[in-house]
Amino acid sequence: MSSLENNNSSWIDWFLGIKGNQFLCRVPTDYVQDTFNQMGLEYFSEILDVILKPVIDSSSGLLYGDEKKWYGMIHARYIRSERGLIAMHRKYLRGDFGSCPNISCYRQNTLPVGLSAVWGKSTVKIHCPRCKSNFHPKSDTQLDGAMFGPSFPDIFFSMLPNLTSPLDDPRT
């Protein structure tokens, strides 16, 4: 589905289907369209038209440029919302982000983290909540770390207190 020749999908469907983008969750259209969530983002009206179209228009000239950054920054905001945390929680429980390579962490599920909230500073890493270390993901992802930000793991565990703390794991 990563080919632009498949004109039966939206830009969001196409982008989420690209190999390496499995860390991302789908940001609902109503969240994307809410002007409050767009505050501070440049070129939002033009890019919004591209990413929300029901069919990819490869003649738009914007494809896979600014809209990737724009969607990524909206994604970083969304995953801090209640609905976004629920979506990321599902992915975390399924192990979609991988597991910690540290043998003493017993394949602890990890979360994506950015080393910076500034676009273009680093690619996404995985964060182990058990050993508190960041690692390069095993997947082929080249997602920008700003799509998650440096505080996402802390926010995730503070907003989902019903999760068992990794320190309470009986394997320790």
Swiss-Prot record:
Domain of life of the native organism: Eukaryota
GO molecular function (one): protein kinase regulator activity
Tissue: Probably not expressed in wild-type flies. In males lacking the Y chromosome, it is testis-specific and constitutes the main component of star-shaped crystals.
SMART domains: CK_II_beta
Alphabetized PROSITE patterns for the sequence: CK2_BETA (PS01101)
Disulphide bridges, residue numbers: none
GO CC aspect terms: cytoplasm; nucleus; protein kinase CK2 complex
Inducers of expression: In wild-type flies, it is strongly down-regulated by double-stranded RNA (dsRNA) interference mediated by Su(Ste) transcripts. In males lacking the Y chromosome, the absence of Su(Ste) locus, relieves such down-regulation, explaining why it is strongly expressed.
Family: Belongs to the casein kinase 2 subunit beta family.
Assembly and oligomerization: Interacts in vitro with the casein kinase 2 alpha subunit (CkII-alpha). The relevance of such interaction is however unclear in vivo.
Role this protein plays: Unknown. In males lacking the Y chromosome, its strong overexpression leads to the appearance of proteinaceous star-shaped crystals in the primary spermatocytes causing meiotic drive, possibly by interfering with normal casein kinase 2 activity.
Note: There are multiple copies of the stellate gene in fruit fly, encoding proteins that are extremely similar, which makes their individual characterization difficult. Thus, most experiments probably do not discriminate between the different members.
Protein name: Stellate protein CG33238
Organism expressing this protein natively: Drosophila melanogaster
Gene: Ste:CG33238
